[in-house]
Regions:
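Intrinsic low-complexity, disordered N-terminal segments enriched in polar/charged/small residues
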Residues: 13-15
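N-terminal Rossmann-like NAD(P) cofactor-binding subdomain of oxidoreductases
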Residues: 88-301, 332-333, 411-412, 416, ...
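Short, Lys/Arg-enriched N-terminal segments with co-localized hydrophobic residues
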Residues: 72-96
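Charged docking surfaces used in two-component/phosphorelay signaling
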Residues: 283-455
């Protein structure tokens, strides 16, 4: 399956090797490292090396060219054990990336609008098609949204006159114009499940913000910093769908982002039980204060379906890939309460946790401070430099002050202290429409692109 390079002379200017399919480069004889390479005829790659050395890899006319170039790079892209993982540089060290044409399904809703803001100047993704319901089809995007634009930042003029197509009946038109789609549709679950599979079977990869496929066994539900290894299930999903390119990958529920990333680095201490109460912003319901007046001076102690998602989804995220499926973890035991509160953006979580091996407070803080995920190692465009941030102040984190930490992509924590019933308790906060929705989906798409799943 693989051709092999045993070694190469680090002092040489260039080496060329004919390749077929994938390529395994084993450079350990020179004390450099090892890594995978995926064949391409259109763009250069960088093969990440362990010993602070960059090797630029370019494929042209079925030739692999390896250059031993300068060592003045700050990051490397290869992560051992995770297959094909790339960041892209030219021989001068400038980051480059193939441009992908993307569609947004559900572009007129609040999350869809957030996608449009995030993708305006994205370095990799170019929006070429907007899709929504038949009510919006045939209208310009500006006409379809009307007075329901939910943000203070105005709609970008380059999207205003784009004509919206029907997400269900114009699928073939979408397939001709995009490399993959984001999906943020408000639709009955069984219909949405069928819609996303139909797109995948049209050979259009789907990055979904929706819940319809979160518990489909061969569909990865990914928080990019936490369980990128679940992407390994995609080939099995393609086999089931009988596709070559098409697949579905989903992000988890917005409520999870305020506590699961904070619990994840603590798994090494053996988490036994978790109790969490989430205080969720109205934008999570697609509402503003104008469209949800009943929330003013009020707290609503029920959000349909949220508690079940908050208790079950983490177990899939912490599960294992076995025989082409993701088998959910059986622990920890999680119990959740979810409340709607009069906050525009930002989900807060009060978290209580019991451990098999109780750590010290210093060990927990150290685990948070030192944790970095694959998006940080790959320097993905939407990845925050500091994924988890702890506030020492007693009155932090606060939604109004801290939801935009890391451009809304960081998860913040505070008030870590021992508890009289559980071992520890703390407060977590995440931005529900950035990290928790569109931003998390864009980051997932960046991860998929960097790993070659859209090739």
């Amino acid at each position: 399956m693989y051709d092999t390079i045993d070694s190469f002379n680090r002092g040489a200017e260039e080496h060329q090797y004919p390749i077929v399919g994938r390529f395994w480069a084993d450079l350990r004889e020179n004390g450099i490292g090892k890594g995978y390479l995926r064949r391409s005829v259109t763009r250069p790659f960088t093969l990440g090396i362990r010993e602070n050395t960059r090797v630029t890899v370019t494929v042209r006319d079925a030739l692999l060219r390896i250059f031993d170039i300068s060592q003045n790079f700050t990051r490397f892209c290869f992560q051992d054990g995770h297959g094909t993982v790339f960041s892209y540089f030219n021989t001068k060290g400038d980051r480059i990336m193939k441009q992908f044409n993307v569609g947004v399904i559900g572009a007129t809703g609040m999350v869809g609008q957030r996608f449009m803001l995030l993708l305006e100047n994205h370095p990799w993704f170019n929006v070429t098609v907007l899709a929504a319901s038949s009510r919006s089809a045939g209208k310009t995007y500006k006409e379809a949204v009307g007075n329901k634009w939910a943000f203070d930042v105005p709609m970008h003029e380059k999207y205003a006159d784009m004509v919206v197509i029907d997400a269900e009946s114009d699928m073939a038109q979408m397939a001709k114009k995009v490399d993959f789609v984001f999906c943020a549709v408000n639709m009955e679950k069984s219909k949405l499940r069928a819609l996303e599979e139909a797109y995948a079977k049209m050979e259009i990869p789907v990055v979904s913000n929706n819940s319809a496929h979160r518990f489909t066994a061969d569909v990865p539900m990914v928080i990019p910093e936490v369980n990128d290894q679940h992407l390994k299930v995609i080939p099995a999903q393609k086999e089931r769908l009988k596709t070559k390119r098409g697949f579905i990958a989903v992000k988890s529920n917005c409520s999870l982002q305020s506590y699961v990333p904070l619990l994840h680095p603590l798994q090494k201490f053996g988490i036994k039980e978790v109790a969490v109460c989430t205080y969720q912003a109205i934008s999570g319901a697609g509402k503003t204060f104008d469209t949800m007046p009943e929330i003013l001076d009020n707290v609503i102690p029920y959000i349909g379906g949220e508690e079940e998602k908050s208790e079950k989804e983490p177990l899939k995220i912490w599960g294992e890939v076995k025989n082409g499926e993701i088998v959910p973890a059986t622990s920890p035991a999680i119990t959740a309460q979810c409340l709607r509160v009069p906050v525009s953006d930002g989900h807060t979580a009060a978290v209580f946790v019991r451990f098999e091996n109780k750590p010290t407070k210093a060990e927990i803080l150290s685990a948070w401070a030192e944790f970095k995920g694959v998006p940080q190692e790959l320097d993905l465009p939407s990845a925050p430099t500091q994924f988890l941030k702890y506030f020492e102040e007693d009155n932090r984190p606060q939604a109004k002050l801290d939801r935009m930490e890391g451009n809304g992509m960081s998860v913040t924590a505070g008030r870590l202290r021992e508890d009289s019933v559980y071992d520890y308790k703390f407060i977590g906060l995440s931005h529900n429409t950035l990290r928790g929705a569109a931003g998390g989906a864009v980051l997932l798409a960046e991860l998929l692109a960097a790993k070659g799943y859209f090739d």
